[in-house]
């Protein structure tokens, strides 16, 4: 756990204790000062949570627990104001937690790795029950796991963003690689993990190209799935690269290629419990070609709809890109 976050949480707890004391003794001036300080500390805690990329579902769950505790304290100590306010916040937080954890969660696209379909500033809705429901803030499944399908645009935690993950978990088939390939992967993975890993991981959104048992090859912008070339047609070319329409599992989507990828030719045979995820912007995507497979253990959900486009704060939000994700 982050030391700064622990100190902030402990400070908030001390402030909360003082607030209860000043409320009981009817010392309004000190109570109001304590309330203001607690509010400012809470804002700093939220900033730290976002900096650490912690699961916001876990934050909501903790806030719900604190509201429930305050409700009980208010009732036991006879602090009517605390009891009423805590009761209201508790039910509001529980509803928000349930909606976000068990139905749909908003997610903002942070990079160009899924262009042209998903652009920086797109806000998408992630279906949290598409692959089975999990207890908020954890990887514990509450319902049976539903496996991702080829062509799904999935949100997940890639292995290199989790400090606890061993490189062999990212490539369980590493023993089947030759010495140069395995060493190259280990060096690349360890470097990425050292620079990007957190305790809670970082959410990525990519397209699932391979499921367990599949043999996948990428040759330039061509994808071969179990020995069959995935149909594609070149739509045109501009300063950003070649625009290609690809048809996978009977559904069409657009990809972009510049022909510059360092992993232009590679092949995988996907092991059990693992999935191959590639960005639609083929030469500008940090994906399975660099860090291996993602595990079904770290699935978050399926990105289904674009509901808002807001690339920068200097521009007004737009609904022009709203629609189902291809």
Residue ranges and their predicted role:
Residues 49-86:
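Alpha-helical transmembrane-segment detector that highlights a single hydrophobic TM helix
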Residues 71, 88, 97, 101, ...:
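Residue-level signal for well-ordered alpha-helical scaffold segments within enzymatic catalytic domains
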Residues 88-89, 93-94, 98, 110, ...:
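Generic hydrophobic alpha-helical membrane-segment signal
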Residues 98-106, 250-257:
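Short charge-dense sequence patches
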Residues 1-33, 37-45, 63-67, 77, ...:
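Soluble "head" domains of membrane/secretory-pathway proteins
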Residues 104-114, 129:
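Membrane-bilayer interface helices and TM-boundary transition segments
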